[in-house]
């Protein structure tokens, strides 16, 4: 691509959006290069990028072009193509959703769109419930406010496969961003009936499916749990509080500053429940209210973070791994106790999620399926079970990045489901005088202590992209040890190991049941390092983990 020529073409043609036109005129040479050095990547996760002017940005033109490519793909593969659309609270999410709807309508693709912002799992659900050909969710999940994205689902409600993404990308690449995109007015589409709002019955059906995930099976528990909840200025407020209240959890305090949708995320610039800064305000509320449980969902409400009180009365944040294995153990224990465990039960987790999950699953007679990073691969496996007539065999799926799913009603992680099941689990143990931290200690005593940590390193711009590629190649060198732990084996998933799709992921198996995984993020300009350390206790594990991190960071030079 001739960057200068493309920039000038945008100056001449990108006039419909005043903000884009104005920004183009302010760009210096360095910013022009970053905005135009490539087209925004379209993959299994759809689009994700910084909002702004240029081919490497999220704007009405890149969204419209992607929508045109998807429309062309749908028309080739479906006799009567249709799409379900949703959007979150991010800056321009509603605008991008309506632009996409207008493009689909102009191409004869029937559009069903949520009338208000909704969690991402409701798009997966609506796609399945309404039997649409595809689903689109405008979101950038837990990224900072400058980002937005465009997530695509297949007819099964699962994020598109690698093959489908390649076919859609091929259609997109045929298009000129200004000359080849058909558009239509959103409001005119609603009036004509080409664009229809998704009815409330679909939302109610979604909430009912979440409620059906309960594993109490008639057992009585004390539901008077003091809960502090934060939707982190996203989409979770109504569905999470509605579900909890309908199931008897009414003692809920919502973090006021983070209650209403706001794509600027004024109280937490990085609205990710994985990081303590995003949970800080909720922790303050929990202390003031003397809450039993703190819950927070990310802006598109597919991740859940929690905090509980320890014996000293101080609040502790639990990791996604810890919450996931607690939920897995609780669900399995309840199913076994009540005779509700299905035939040939299955648990699905990602390769970067703690291996203790597999030990717990084995204890209860579950088969574990390990998949690549990304909940779409968990959804894909649920789909395979469904095709075999065995959807009920699926018991639980989770990933270390705070994503959980207890049923097959959607094919993506569900923060509404996660929030509800965490509350139920908390109440169940509290009724017996057991805290979640007590239960966690019990699991460590049974299966051995394991520390799992995640370290992220940011690399912005075109230079950063090249740097990440260089670092990944450096890690493929003949590394003998990390932190004094010998490398027993290197698993390079770029070769498609264990029947999994090829992926830019390296996993070093170290001695003493330790490991380190290195991969670039699929949604942000970051390299991620996942470390797992088995040891006698937390102190010993933290010491080893620190040494492994030091050695790993040497390869960033």
Model-predicted segments: where are they?
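N-terminal small/polar loop signature for handling phosphorylated ligands or for N-terminal nucleophile
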Residues: 84-147, 246-305
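Conserved phosphate/anionic-ligand binding catalytic regions in large, soluble enzymes, centered on
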Residues: 36-56, 140-141, 227, 231-243, ...
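Glycine-rich phosphate-binding loop plus the immediately following alpha-helix
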Residues: 153-183, 321-344, 349-358, 427
